[in-house]
Amino acid sequence: YQQLMRERSNKVKNHIAANHSEKVKHIISMVPDGGNYKDLPEEYKDSRNFHVAWTRFASDKPAPTIDTGHRHHFHYKYNRVPTVRECARLQSFPDDFIFLGNKTQQFRQVGNAVPPIMAECIAKQLKKYLGEN
C-alpha cells in the first residue's frame, strides 16, 4: 500500500504536524492506544472540552472514518493530531496529490472526499454492470 501511494511522488506534501502546547501533548499522552477521552484522569476530562470524538487511533486496527474535522483523533504513536497527509493516506490519496488552501480547508477536502481506491472499485463495477446491459 505504501509503495502504491508513493509511486509517482518524490516528496511528501501536506505533512506538517500541529504545534501543540506541552499541556495538550501531556493530555494526549495519557490517552492509550485505541482509547479516548474517557480514559483520561477526571481532572483532565474538561480541560480542553474533550468529548467522545477525541480518540487515539489504534495501532493494530483499521482507522476510524476520516471526517472534515482535524482535531478529532490523535496519532496512534505520536502525541499530536494526524497531519493532512496522514489522513489523506488513510483515505488512499497518493502522495503526489496536493491539497490546497489553509490547513482547515485541506482537512475538509480530505474528509469530504470519496477515497480514490474505493471510487475506482465502484467505477469498475459500474462499468462491468453497464457493459452487460
Tell me what each language-model feature is.
Residues Y1-N133:
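C-terminal target-recognition/interaction regions appended to catalytic cores
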